[in-house]
Amino acid sequence: MNSKLKKILYPHQLECLNASLKEKRGIFILPTGSGKTYIQIAIGLDDILKKKDNNESGIYVVNVPRILLSYQILKEFFEMTNKFEVPCDYLIVHSGTSIDEDGLLNLHNENLPWRDIRVTTSTEEIKEEVEFSKKNKRPLIVIQTYHSAHLTKSVLNELNLPIDVKLNDECQYMVSEEFSNQIDDKSAIKQFHFTATAKNANVIGMNQKDKWGEKLYVMTPREAIDRGIIVPPRMIVSTSLEDFSEEDLRKSFSKIVYQDWINLKKLNNKVSNKLLIKTRGTDDMSNFIKSKEAKELIQQGVHIFVIGSNKRVDNWYNGEVYRRPEWLELLKSCGADDSKEVICLHFDILSEGIDVPGFGGVSFFNSPELDKFVQNYGRSARLHKQDRENLKKGLITTDNREDWVKPYSYVIVHEYNDINKSQSNTIYEMIENLREYGFVPERDITIEQVRGISENEEMEDLLDDDSKKVVKGKLIDDWLIKYELESEKTASLSNDRFDTTDEVVIEYFNELFGDEK
């Protein structure tokens, strides 16, 4: 293992790198926010540095589910190889737009030659890049979507060249009929899979060790919380003073987002807040963009980001539409700026490993499946940079969060009276399991119902039924916090308007999360 690389990794990342040196196949399961991307980079870079010492080079492939994620992985890999002064060639294989060269030039080591980075789906161009790198004995790092991976594979098969290290990010997407042929790639000398949410299934599920290899490293969300790698969730259940239906909620969506924002600011007043909104689909986002609430928030200085594959939404920021890589850079820049307030609305695309710092809360408008809940929660579970430094210095601890800048990830849910409060109950159960049992997020699926995603495919829209797009119902007033689960072991009740059923639930919460004797 490279000694310089060893010094910059956190202990759990170093454990993962050590595990990869002992095996040629395997799965790494770590919660969102724990730095899986840097583990992947470390595995690839360690092999690159070893070959460099022997005047050799190799081919390194990183597979991702989305075009947007590929640009982020490229930037982080590029930054690390330039810090280590390793001249590498890069190739992006998917149908997306060109890269942001200005952003990469800011990271470029002047002692290394600059070479333009192609974004292509042409096998001829892929072949040219592979042959150039081999001729000049330079490592080639290919970052591609699962949807386009077959193009690179066909070129390497034609040239009879192996992949030295293959890294499958968000590998749960390989558990599909479309991408299953990529699981056990015999042309890869080493192949490792990374996920926060394992998927089990017959024949090709991640429980099939003969195809995926052993689980080389598993960290539960609870363990990550206890080790100070991510912050714990704090659940906020909101409701109105009167009963309302889903139609009322749909009509009042923008108003409720505005109130979620106000509530988060009241609860989390140590920082400039950043809230991620998990919507039900395009209609929610499109209606919000046009709403007076969005205009008011922008006038107040809040940075509003909305993203979707549908042209009605696109990559929207404060009234303007941007190219996706530029939109992501703007979001990351605002996310990293402690002085800026941010609200970001999405349906699914930000769930898949997009690393945006700063989110302190996430608001759900539907009950996601377990893996989607963990991914969205993970977007807001990253440590504040000041807390990370204070933990290193021993100034704060994980068992006393009073002095933390960001002690929790605030998870906001909304009770739907006409469907028996199923959303808040479902998410509460997920949080309970995460806190109490340190579960490994896995989901069993029936493979006949699962196919791969296209790199540009519009995800399922919960409002795609035309009959559901008619905005009916009444506007909801007097939105309030009903109760909040304050920490792993205590429940704080912030309102006394409860009926008999609620009192039973509250009693159960107090029994479950009451102080330990």
Task: Give residue spans per PLM region.
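Walker A/P-loop
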Residues: 23-44
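Conserved Walker A/P-loop ATP-binding site and its immediately adjacent core
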Residues: 39, 56-81, 85, 89-98, ...
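Conserved helix/coil segment N-terminal to the catalytic DExD/H
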Residues: 123-162, 177, 181
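Post-DEXD/H (motif II) to motif III coupling segment of the RecA-like Helicase ATP-binding lobe
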Residues: 172-233
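A conserved SF2-helicase RecA2
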Residues: 224-231, 386-491, 495-499
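Conserved RecA-like P-loop NTPase helicase motor core
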Residues: 311-441
